[in-house]
Structures are given as C-alpha cells and as structure tokens.
Regions:
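Short carbohydrate-recognition loop motifs
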Residues: 1-26
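Extracellular ligand-binding interfaces
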Residues: 18-113, 117, 125-139
C-alpha cells in the first residue's frame, strides 16, 4: 500500500488486515539471505493503527539452524509461539506508540541470532492492524 499511512521509506509498505486474535504475514526460503554479525541490531519499522490497536506486536526471524525459534515481542503476552523468556519469545518492552512510525530494535544476541544467516521473517499481531516497512539489521 502507498497511503494511509504513507510508507516510512520507498513507495510501498505492507499493511495487515484488521483481525481479532493472532494474525501474521511472513516469508521464508529466501534465496537472497543475510548474515547477522556479532553485535548487530535487528530493526523493523511499524505503524500501529490507532483506531484498531493490536495488544501485541511480534517479529520472528528464521535461520538455517534453528528455524523460527527467534522472536521478540512488545505489549501483552498473547501470542503463543515459543517459550517466554528465551530466544524463542523475548519480551522487549511495552507496545510502541500508535499513529506514528516507530523503529523496533532488538539486539541480535537477545534472540540467539549472532552469527546466523536469515532466510525468513514474520510480522505477527494479536488483534488490530499495523503497517510494516523497512526491516533488516543495523551495525553499531
């Protein structure tokens, strides 16, 4: 989509449907992979719909050695993937502010991704709607 909200970067962003409960969009099996180096930070830009606020936002990463067992979440603990307090479901903080673009940041080490190569990501919500834009990594 290209408006409501305007993308954070480029000309298009990906917006979820308005859904009750757990919902997500994702990709895996990417042939254009990237490696996470020690000390890097994983980032994703999200815009939470203030009229349809989710109670939880989760980002998931898929690597070649441990699959989808790398997750970080913000807000309530409603999404059942992984084990709380581990690399498979790490609480990062409260739900980000709604109605503006927010850069989500997760130290790769918090979700067990230092030195791993990614081939998939998932953008998961509980209730509500969000728009997602640039996702990748940042080097300190």
């Amino acid at each position: 989509m290209s408006s409501n909200p305007a993308p954070f970067s480029g000309t298009l962003a990906s917006q979820s449907n308005i859904v009750s409960g757990e919902h997500q969009h994702y990709f895996f099996g990417a042939t254009n992979t990237f490696t996470i180096n020690t000390g890097e930070t994983l980032v994703a830009y999200v815009y939470l719909d203030p009229a349809n606020l989710p109670s939880e936002v989760m980002v998931q990463w898929k690597d070649f050695s441990n699959g989808w067992e790398h997750r970080a979440y913000w807000g309530a603990n409603n999404i059942s993937f992984g084990v709380a307090g581990t690399n498979s479901r790490r609480f990062i903080g409260p739900l980000p502010p709604a109605g503006q673009w927010v850069r989500l940041e997760v130290a790769a080490s918090l979700v067990g991704l230092d030195g791993q190569t990614l081939n998939g990501m998932a953008f998961t919500l509980f209730d509500g709607r969000a728009t997602w834009d640039h996702a990748g990594k940042a080097t300190p």
